[in-house]
Swiss-Prot record:
GO cellular component: plasma membrane
GO MF annotations, alphabetized: amino-acid betaine transmembrane transporter activity; antiporter activity; choline transmembrane transporter activity
Location relative to the cell: Cell membrane
Stated name of the protein: Quaternary ammonium compound-resistance protein QacH
One Pfam family per UniProt: Multi_Drug_Res
Organism annotation: Staphylococcus saprophyticus
InterPro entries, A to Z: Small_drug/metabolite_transptr, Small_multidrug_res
Gene Ontology BP terms: glycine betaine transport
Keyword Transmembrane helix among UniProt keywords: yes
Keyword Transport attached: yes
Chain's role: Multidrug exporter. Is implicated for the resistance to bacteriocidal quaternary ammonium compounds.
NCBIfam families the record matches: qac_SMR_H, QacCGHJ
Residue stretches spanning the membrane: 1-21, 26-46, 57-77, 84-104
Lineage, top ranks: Bacteria, Bacillati, Bacillota, Bacilli, Bacillales
Length: 107
């Protein structure tokens, strides 16, 4: 169950980040409301995850996978450019998260 909480937290964070960009500095009402609600949901599920998993694994997974998914959203939805160094860096982040979850602190 903690990994489901973590997944829900990550997805909520990515949604919140996408709508944060769409809110245009909190000048648009609906994207602003969606941003706030998404981050509330995100931190609720992140706190539930931390009840079951170590902080280092939880936070590294949340931040790393959130960054990867947010980058994908930025490229696909907002048509932002990504270069080879960014792609290599994202692959290394994924590799690091997998290693940490496989060999990190005991669960």
């Amino acid at each position: 169950m903690p990994y489901l909480y973590l997944l829900l937290s990550i997805v909520s964070e990515v949604i919140g980040s996408a709508f944060l960009k769409s809110s245009d500095g909190f000048s648009k009402l609906y994207p602003t409301i969606t941003t706030i609600i998404s981050f509330l949901i995100c931190f609720y599920f992140l706190s539930k995850t931390m009840q079951h998993l170590p902080l280092n694994i939880t936070y590294a997974s949340w931040a790393g996978l959130g960054l990867v998914l947010t980058t994908i959203v930025s490229v696909l939805i907002f048509k932002e450019q990504i270069n080879l160094i960014s792609i290599i860096s994202i692959i290394l982040i994924i590799f690091g998260v997998v290693l940490l979850n496989t060999f990190g602190s005991s669960h």
